[in-house]
From Swiss-Prot:
Description of how the protein assembles with itself and partners: Part of the 50S ribosomal subunit.
GO MF annotation terms: rRNA binding; structural constituent of ribosome
Natural source organism: Prochlorococcus marinus subsp. pastoris (strain CCMP1986 / NIES-2087 / MED4)
Compositional bias per record (Basic and acidic residues), positions renumbered to this chain: 74-86
This protein's UniProt keywords: Ribonucleoprotein, Ribosomal protein, RNA-binding, rRNA-binding
Gene: rpmE
Name of the protein this chain belongs to: Large ribosomal subunit protein bL31
Length: 86
């Protein structure tokens, strides 16, 4: 039997609230949980995910440190390897 004065009060039907609307109930140590995002409005779960066209990590690194683009670096390496093969 747990000690009665050291454990927090358990609410088996705690309400999860998102944008002023009760979206689900769960067990918690608080009677209400206010959340900004839940699976019902998150883009990944709703299928409205936007795909952003961003630079790759290697391209950003090359650009940041002034090494040109990743394509030019790899093309230089292939040209040098072809010269050494001859």
């Amino acid at each position: 039997m747990p000690k009665s004065e050291i454990h927090p009060k358990w609410y088996p039907d705690a309400k999860v609230i998102c944008n002023g609307e009760v979206v689900m109930t769960t067990g918690s140590t608080k009677p209400e949980l206010h959340v900004d995002v839940w699976s019902g409005n998150h883009p990944f779960f709703t299928g409205t995910q936007k795909i952003l066209d961003t630079e790759g990590r290697v391209d950003r690194f090359m650009k940041k440190y002034g090494m040109g683009s990743a394509d030019s670096a790899t093309s230089k390496e292939t040209k040098e390897s072809k010269k050494s093969d001859k």
